[in-house]
Each structure stands twice: as C-alpha cells, then as structure tokens.
Amino acid sequence: MDDEETSEINSVQGQDEDVQLEVQPQAQGPQDRQVDAIEQAWNNATQDEQSPPAEEAFQDPLAIDGEGGNAPEAMVEDVLQDDTASEGSHPSSDMSLETPGSEDDSDLELLPRWMIPQNRLRSAVDMMVSQARNRDGGIAALLNRDNFLQRVRSIVFSQERRRSRTSEETSQEAADAEQPNDPPPQQPPRPPIDIGFDTNLPAEHSYFGNHLSRVPGVDYLEVGSVHHMLIFLHQHILFPGEVLPFMIDGRMFDEDMPGLDGLIFGVGFPLMQPPEDNPLKLYGVTCQIYERGESGRGLVFYKSRALQRIVINCEDIQGSPQYIARNPTSKCFSKVKILPEYFLPEPLQSVEMGSMARFRDIPSMRDKYRRFQLSTTTWPSDACQEYSFASIVERARQRLESQKIDTMPKCPIQLSFWLVRNLHLTEKMMRLTFLTDSVNTRLQLIKSTFKDESLFFCRYCNSSLAHCADLFAMSKHGVQTQYCNPDGYIHETNTVYRVMSHAIGYSGEPSTKFSWFPGYQWHIILCKFCAQHVGWEFKAVQPNLTPRVFFGLAGSSVRIGKASENTPFNGSTYVVRNMLRLISNEME
C-alpha cells in the first residue's frame, strides 16, 4: 500500500474514532476496526461517484449478463487506478506478463464493455472485502499482497492487447458479446515436420547422467495373485509400458532390493475414482526398477517401468502412503492384487475353415478368403468389421501418421495401453480404459474417440492453448512422456510443435541445465490469461537439430477437451469469473 493510501486510512481512523467506540467490543476487535477503516477509505475515494444500490453490489458476480450496474464509467477507472504501481508494488510479478511500463492509463478508454462490466467489478470488490474479513490481516493484508489489483488490471490490459492484434478483432468483440459460445476457429493447416533429433535420448532420460547402472530382471506377476509390496502415490495416471523416472532417498529401496533383480513396487493413483459400490479401492500399477545411479546430493536416480494394473484395498495399507515425487521419508506397505487382461480374437478367426485356412495369411487371397468366411456365418460384415482388431490398428495408424511415431506395439494388450498415451483421451475416458479388464472393450473405447477433434485447455482458466493434432513424438515412447526435474518433481509432458497465437507468456530466463532434450534449451511458459505455469518452450542451441522450436505442455496444468465443447476459445466470457478465481486463490 502506498503512502497516499496509508495517510488516507489514518485520517479516516481519526475521524471515525467515535463511531467505532459505539460498537460492542465482543462483536468487533482491532482487526475488524482496521478492516472498517480501510472500507471507509475505499468509500471516501469513490464517494463523488454514483454507487450502485446495495442489492446490486452483491449480485451474482459469476453471471455474464444482468441488469443493474448503473455506476458511471468513472467507477471502473477509479477502481483500476486505485492500485497503480508504487514503490512497494511488483508490476512484473508472476501474475503480470508485460513490462512494468507497458500499462498506459489511456488504454482504459479502449476497454471493451464486456471485458469488465461495471457492476461485476464492484461485485468482485465487494466479494474481496467480505471474504477478507475473517482472514489474517483483513483487507489491509489483501491490498498489500503483491499489489493484487494492479495484477488483475494487467491481466485485463493483456486481454485487450491480444484482442487488438489484428484488424478483424474489433468487429469480433461485438459478436463475442452477443454470441459467446461461437465454435472455435478452424485449425490452421499443419506443415510437414522434419525431426533431426535422436528420439532415443529423451527415452533414456540422459539428463540423469551417464553413470546409471543397469538393474536386470523383468518380472510379470501371476494374474489374480496377491502380493505384499512397498507402495507410493503418483499425481498422474500411468499405464503399463510407461517409464517412470524419479529421485528418492536410496534407503527407501536398497534394503528391500533382492540381489540383482529389480525391485517391484506399487504406485497408486488418487485421481482414479473408485467404483461407487466399493469406495475403499485404490487403483494403480506395479513398477520395476531397471536403472539406478547416484545424484551426488544424497538422492538416487531411478528409472522404472510400469508393468501390470493392480487394485489395493485401502484397509490393507500399513502406514501413510506418500507421493513418490515429493521425496517420501517413510515406507508404506500394502497387499496388492494383479488385475487380468482379457483379449478375445477376431470373430472370423474362431470360424473353423478346415483346409482353406491356409489361404488366410496369403496377402493376395486375404480379401477373397474373408468374403468366403462371411458367407458361411450369420454375422453381417459390418458387425465383423466393427470388432476387427486389424481395422482399429489401421485407423489408429492413419491418425498417428502425422506424429512421426514408428514404434507401435503389435501385442494387443500393449497396443491398447500405448494408444491411450498417444491418442490423448479425456480424463474420463482414461479412467474408463484403465478400469476395464477387457482389451477388446478398451480398444472399442479408444476407437470411439477417433472422430473427435480435441484441444489442450488451461486447467486453471479454460483458455485454449494448442490443438491435439499438433502433437508429435520427440521420444521413441511417443508424444507423452514422464520426466523428472532437478528437484525430483515428475512432469507428464506432451510435446507439440506449436501453440495458439498469443496463448502463452514467458517466465524467467532460458536454460540448458538438466534439459530433457539434449541440445535444446528450455524456457518456462505461462498461460497468457491466468499466468499459471503450463509447460516449457524448447529451442535448439545446436545448428543441426530440428525442429528448431517446440513446446512441452505439463499434464498437471492442462486438460484435454473436445473442440466442440461449450468453452470460449480465448476465455472472453470467463474474464470476470477468472478474476474472482484469482482473487480467491490469492487469499488462500
């Protein structure tokens, strides 16, 4: 808070001292008196303007349209200018992506009316006041916290600058106000991608160093068997076949590692909602360590691979399970049950054709043989084609052709899990595919998403960031891979070769240290709308690497949704809602 506001508050405290003494001590303490003084200062600063009635001031701030809000336009200007930059402010904090001198008060005249409605802004301020009453420090602490109103103002200006980039956006603003749910614009054509990079390097997680030693042994446990093992938690959903790198205190494992065989442990997923009929179930996977090495900081690097799906009865857990990415300090054990994987062959393969079966594998005779088989059954050809494993594989191959992936597994069980990771399903669909024991059902669920056009949305403000069609593989494991940062946090990273125009900002300075992609520097990127971390930009520092620039979106910060879902493309109608969400987050 600057000196002018402080002196004004002190003067108000002196003028209203008699009024404050009339309040009962039981109902108002020193903190509440300070809150009332700041509220009075706020009212004095705007007393020359016509304020809306009390019932209008507390209208639902999440509504987009509504009556009321008759305060003049000067009210908007007063509130925005109330928290301008001062000696104690931080205009270039993590919520502001522009330079300190980029805000010009003349921009206030250019603010579109839908951007920050008068009555909604007043309601937002009233909500800040009402929610801050019971917080430590009250409103004074809120106003002192990194100059919050200035940061909200910066976000509003950032939105306006993005809107005014092209000549078409002036006319588009009126259309957005009247029809906020217009379909998103068409995806721009995808140029050909030339990858001049060894995709084996990210898969080997070479940023851990070259001193890792191989731990032999890959053990698959019997389906339906129950085992007692060490368990951890993980913030993402892993599917069998994925690699999980992590850093942890070596004492957590070394005592339990049997000889030279890799240790098998369990990883549970709290995000995997259990069935309603049995809420005490925790689903996860078994992981086996296959490489280890010293980090030099008291921690040990481990590489593990997810092997089989498991289910854990929460009543059998001994101890408090901890997240594997948060440097667990205590061991937790539990009984785990290995879940089955059922696969039924294609319907026509179960039809016995006697001596004619020898024509099945001859390419030139395959179609004729299939037609002859269909003529001997009561099944229509469409039904057989619908459940054909080869048909699903071919359609998946065509969909992934542009992603430069040539490591598609042939085993149906492994393929079903591999497709989930590389086709980018919604969270609901990922849970369904994980919970099913039938490989055929899993493939049918995956097939149902082939026609969907999906986008990456910011998980915090629903702004669209990138098209899922722009995914490509910078690792031999596919477009989605788990990586570990120097602090041990595990990021699920999705590689795309471009993001939407004006969708991101940058934080900090680029660096090549601990780069997941050797030869590339990384730079933290933020959502341009809410300034939350959403991933990294990777830029080549060696002249022979291609692509020169690509992006990695953090799975914990983005979500996948259909392009047709009822979400504004640039978050235009969510401006006030997300301002309030930011206010709420700042007070927590």
UniProtKB/Swiss-Prot annotation:
CULT domain: residues covered: 453-562
Residues reported to bind Zn(2+): 458, 461, 527, 530
InterPro entries (UniProt xref): CULT, Lon_prtase_N, Yippee/Mis18/Cereblon
Pfam families referenced in this protein's UniProt entry, alphabetically: Yippee-Mis18
Record pathway: Protein modification; protein ubiquitination
Limits of the Lon N-terminal domain: 228-454
Primary site of residence: nucleus
Biased composition (Pro residues): 181-192
Sorted UniProt keywords: Metal-binding, Nucleus, Ubl conjugation, Ubl conjugation pathway, Zinc
Post-translational modification as stated in the protein's UniProt record: Ubiquitinated.
Keyword DNA repair: no
Biased composition (Polar residues): 41-50, 86-96
CDD domains: CRBN_C_like
Sequence ranges of Acidic residues compositional bias: 75-85
Chain residue ranges for the region called Disordered: 1-107, 159-197
Basic and acidic residues: compositionally biased ranges: 159-168
Presence of keyword Nucleus: yes
GO MF, any single term: metal ion binding
Localization per Swiss-Prot or TrEMBL: Nucleus
Annotated Gene Ontology cellular component terms: nucleus
Any one biological process term the GO annotation gives: positive regulation of Wnt signaling pathway
Subunit architecture: Likely a component of a DCX (DDB1-CUL4-X-box) protein ligase complex. May interact with pic/DDB1.
Function: Substrate recognition component of a DCX (DDB1-CUL4-X-box) E3 protein ligase complex that mediates the ubiquitination and subsequent proteasomal degradation of target proteins. Has an essential role in mediating growth by negatively regulating insulin signaling. It also has a role in maintaining presynaptic function in the neuromuscular junction synapses of third-instar larvae.
Family: Belongs to the CRBN family.
Protein name: Protein cereblon
Organism taxonomic ancestry: Eukaryota, Metazoa, Ecdysozoa, Arthropoda, Hexapoda
Name of the encoding gene: ohgt
